[in-house]
């Protein structure tokens, strides 16, 4: 599948095209079982070709060959977000690339880090008791649509975080399985 996406990008990409890649490979420090090392290498290569990437913390660690457990062991420390910032800065493959690290758990909050070569910021949201299937897809869709429509990346991330925060708060109140989306 990664080869098909590469072919699509190479066929249709123009100078004005924005390519966003959500390098889905794992979560909670673990690689998804369907992913081989070869597939991960291809996804990492795909991410390097993108204008914007939206990895979660596990995927950022895979992209940068960083030890997730070691990094995450600092999650209660005051410098945790700064440590993530340092790792994210090492992930840039070209000067115009932008990185949004999603779903960084710290205390009772989730943070999303927005990184460019020149700047970094974090958007904070309340955590509503765990993960919800599909939120990463919704997040990337809102960010991409907003950026394509001329919004700054930080503004786009704030919009996505606001929507998902409301949606997960409402969903957490319902008696449904979180994997049902």
Q: Residues of each region from the PLM?
A:
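Short, small-residue alpha-helix embedded
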Residues: 62, 129-153, 157
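Hydrophobic residues at beta-strand termini and immediately following loops
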Residues: 123
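Conserved phosphate/ATP/ADP-binding segment of small-molecule kinases
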Residues: 33-120
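Glycine-rich beta-alpha junction loops
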Residues: 25, 59, 103-107, 126-129, ...
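Glycine/small-residue-rich loop that forms an oxyanion/phosphate-binding "nest" at active or ligand-binding sites
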Residues: 1-45
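Charged C-terminal helix
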Residues: 154-181
């Amino acid at each position: 599948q990664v080869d098909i996406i590469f072919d699509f990008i190479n066929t249709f990409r123009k100078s004005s095209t924005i390519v966003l890649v959500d390098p889905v490979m794992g979560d909670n420090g673990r690689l998804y079982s369907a992913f081989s090392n070869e597939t991960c290498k291809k996804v990492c290569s795909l991410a390097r070709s993108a204008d914007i990437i939206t990895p979660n913390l596990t995927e950022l660690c895979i992209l940068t060959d960083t030890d997730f457990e070691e990094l995450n062991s600092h999650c209660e420390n005051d410098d945790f977000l700064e440590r993530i910032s340092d790792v994210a800065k090492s992930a840039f493959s070209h000067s115009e690339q932008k990185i949004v690290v999603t779903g960084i758990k710290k205390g009772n909050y989730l943070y999303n880090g927005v990184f460019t070569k020149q700047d970094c910021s974090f958007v904070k949201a309340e955590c509503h008791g765990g993960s919800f299937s599909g939120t990463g897809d919704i997040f990337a869709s809102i960010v991409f649509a907003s950026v394509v429509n001329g919004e700054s990346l930080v503004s786009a991330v704030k919009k996505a975080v606001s929507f998902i925060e409301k949606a997960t708060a409402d969903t957490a109140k319902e008696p449904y399985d979180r994997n049902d989306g």
